[in-house]
Amino acid sequence: MGRLSAEEGALLVRLARRAVEEYLENARVIEPPRDTPPSLREKSGVFVTIEKILVDPLARRARRELRGCIGYPEPVLPLAEATIHAAIAAATEDPRFPPMTPRELDTVVFEVSVLTKPEPVDYRSPEELPDKIKVGRDGLIVEYGAARGLLLPQVAVDEGWDPEEFLSYACLKAGLRDDAWRHGGLKVYRFQAQIFVETTPKGDVVERFLEVV
């Protein structure tokens, strides 16, 4: 599928929020609206990230803290439908956090990352891998046997990682040693993401552009 417009991205983010609101308050899984644009009915991978806004009264500024992130790496569902299910799962099923409560809805922002189909990274030796990855452009999936780890493109940017660190943390996410990528036998996939995020809880939605390193 092609790139989404700002309006389509805003629809997805608002759909993610409404899905979580309805699920937490009424235990109901919503359906995509009947007037959902055709572009949002195409199958696509998608991740929904929920971040809690924490205000430091002394510094007089806010920071964001992860509250949940779950999604579909592969295009297995229509985008709008996948966004609904990913949003609910991010709010209630992320094993790193307790399920969200309705009172938290006014203190979190929603981010939707629409993914391209993951493509395998061809390499002959592990030393080639860092040169085949662009921080700010690529997200990573690493696989070794049944182990699998995924990191979105914005994670490497937010953490200030270089390609080697990105690979190492993707391995850790898969439950492997951080240097597993250096020993061969690892399947590595890369993908890109178009990112839309609320600027404030229930506020405007903007597209986030990452700086490619």
Curated annotation (Swiss-Prot):
PROSITE patterns reported in the protein's UniProt record: AMMECR1 (PS51112)
Q: Which SUPFAM superfamilies match?
A: AMMECR1-like (SSF143447)
A matching Pfam family: AMMECR1
**Annotated AMMECR1 domain residues:** 7-207
Superkingdom, natural source: Archaea
PANTHER family xrefs? AMME SYNDROME CANDIDATE GENE 1 PROTEIN, AMMECR1 HOMOLOG
HAMAP family, from UniProt? AMMECR1
Q: What is this protein called?
A: Protein Tpen_0748
